[in-house]
Amino acid sequence: MTKVFINGEFIDQNEAKVSYEDRGYVFGDGIYEYIRAYDGKLFTVTEHFERFIRSASEIQLDLGYTVEELIDVVRELLKVNNIQNGGIYIQATRGVAPRNHSFPTPEVKPVIMAFAKSYDRPYDDLENGINAATVEDIRWLRCDIKSLNLLGNVLAKEYAVKYNAGEAIQHRGETVTEGASSNVYAIKDGAIYTHPVNNYILNGITRKVIKWISEDEDIPFKEETFTVEFLKNADEVIVSSTSAEVTPVVKIDGEQVGDGKVGPVTRQLQEGFNKYIESRSS
């Protein structure tokens, strides 16, 4: 039987329940993280939980856990479910209290839940690339917080699905921000361009890894804003996330990117990413 973690206990998934008054359910008042496991080891887990705790701090939520304690939780979750390759979803809400927009009283504690599932790497997408569709970014102004409020992302992703695209690339006006569930990069003349870290994007963990690889390989990494037109005229385009890794984009809005094939810089980043899986998994 699959086990899930809820507030300090590992229980059968059939016994896992959420209160109808949980603030995550009625307000989306909470945060989450998603962590990848390769061969039974957690990839960049410290970076993920440092971001998790930062997100909690930004919404004035005291988790009551340290990074090390959270790592212990997800390690045990992998163990009890015998998962070697897959992902761990963990979220924290502001707890259970009568519905009121203001914060509950201090005795109300967060509800922390986590589950793990097995899945393989996205080999086909990594090898052949995906199509993407551009869409106006309608999300709130604190996209740096990994909030449970994902309605804007959901609507963007559904727009992409309707156009047979694997990702929605969002833009505010003409400025590209990020994907519905990824960071976005334009590669031009051997340099990588991506939106700077601020409140308009999530500072992705895979984005950090790509930056590390760029430093290792002496690839220019430019954290600058760029337009939809610049993106469509790039030599290569990639999106990155914990689940997507380093995924090439070969078409945007039905238009071919570059020569329509996965480019050399993308392949270089993918090779570097594989090396980091080995060196940063524990």
Swiss-Prot record:
Record Pfam families: Aminotran_4
Lineage top rank: taxon: Bacteria
Reactions catalysed: D-alanine + 2-oxoglutarate = D-glutamate + pyruvate
Source organism of the structure: Staphylococcus haemolyticus
Modified residues (N6-(pyridoxal phosphate)lysine): 146
GO MF assignments: D-alanine-2-oxoglutarate aminotransferase activity; pyridoxal phosphate binding
Name under which the protein is recorded: D-alanine aminotransferase
UniProt-listed Enzyme Commission number(s): 2.6.1.21
Cross-referenced InterPro entries: Aminotrans_IV, Aminotrans_IV_CS, Aminotransferase-like, BCAT-like_C, BCAT-like_N, Class-IV_PLP-Dep_Aminotrnsfr, D_amino_transT
Binding site for pyridoxal 5'-phosphate: 51, 178
